[in-house]
Amino acid sequence: MSLPHDPHAWLEEVDGDAALAWVRERNAVTLAELEGAPAYAPLQARLAAILNARERIAHVAKHAAYFYNFWRDEDHVRGIWRRTTLAQYRLATPSWETVLDLDALARDEGENWVWAGARFLPLPAEAESDAEAKTDHCLLSFSRGGGDATVVREFDVTARAFVEGGFALPQAKSDVGWIDRDTLLVGTDTGPGSMTSSGYPRMVREWRRGTPLEHARIVYEAAEDDLSASAYKVFTPGHEMQFVQRQLSFYASELFLRQGDTLLKIDKPDSANAFTVRDQLVIELRADWETVGRTYPQGALLAIALARFLRGERDFAVLFAPSAARSLDAVAMTRSALLLTELDNVANRIVELTELDGAWSRRVVDAPALGSLGVAPVDRHGSDEYFLSVNDFLTPTSLYLGRAGTDERELLKALPALFDASRLTVSQQHAASRDGTPVPYFLVMDKDTLLDGSNPTLLYG
């Protein structure tokens, strides 16, 4: 069956002259209306000052003894990749060591490089001081102009230079990760048949250093009409394992445990996400799942020892059960805890889960509820510390250093206040829709406001 003619298909050529001209024409119409408004100039100046302010939180990712950050500003348009220590990061003005200057690299190579991330080989279990030299290499990804396809190159952070003769992938929609210092799991374009019809990797290869990529062992091949295939290694000390994922569509996948030359399929719903936490298999459901005489609801988070699951047992511990007012927003993992970010009537709550011999304990973390909370582990394999980002209607974004097992946390960074919030207050209220459904909402107002029904109110949602 032939597809119907799409008269607007030319707009999909995002860099095409016709598409860019069309965008310029539409932008001109919008800009003319915006710029004609009296409030435009002062508002534009104010927003530009906020966006370009140096008072931004430099979020970091830890590797070995250093905390890395990618930073852009008016002096570094493409950006610099830099690092510092925790002691320095605690200071108002940390001392940063530049690891890579992307503006200089783009200029020297004549390329329109856009940063697409760094991937380190995780530290082994021994002390950082002894292990750092073994994990000073990382895989850097760059795109040309910000596209989906990237170039991957091995980089030495100690020498601050690309590794001569190191791992390198030409521009493609690639998926790559470490097995060990000399071995990668790679999905990329190696010629005809290596990519799916969607343009993503169809094959996963195990690539040894110093060998041709096209000769690398094929670990898995997806179907041509699948979305993609990928693989990764779990580096949790004592629970190292490898998984292969067959992505059937954006919201459906199959997961396989790699055991030597064998791929053992994880018997989960295609719509569910699954990952391991030490020896536990954790499954997040996107649809109801009936198994062994019990139905688990959409949105539930389940756990069971992986070894027991592979033996056919299905008596899951329910780590989270949704309700009409309660949903799971995010999951983060530290060395010994799972941190769930829950939404209860659209208010945030962080719940800390710890497991011992298959039994899970639950503790609600004391954190602000009427705002946005974001949790990111500092070192998911080696530490119970985590970063907690907090902001609400009246509080500028603040970054804390917390630790599983305690509510004590250290304020690391905070943005400056852009208005005086001392006279304001925030509360959560509930209204009822016509069918009786409760609708939670937040109310921001002056502390001295009289609730007599006569106050002008700005409603949005």
What are the residue ranges of the model-derived segments?
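Serine-hydrolase catalytic core recognition
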Residues: A131, A369-G461
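Multi-bladed beta-propeller domains
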Residues: L3, A9-V14, A32-R54, Q88-V114, ...
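Solenoidal tandem-repeat scaffolds enriched in leucines and small polar residues
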Residues: R181-L257
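Conserved beta-propeller blade repeats
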Residues: A53-F70, E109-S141, A168-L185, A222-Q245, ...
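Structural motif
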Residues: D75-R82, G147-R153, G193-E206, M241, ...
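Hydrophobic or amphipathic alpha-helical targeting/insertion segments
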Residues: R83-L86, V151, D156-V163, L169-P192
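Long amphipathic N-terminal alpha/beta scaffold segment
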Residues: P42, R46-L86
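Zn2+-dependent metallopeptidase catalytic domains
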Residues: M1-N27, H59
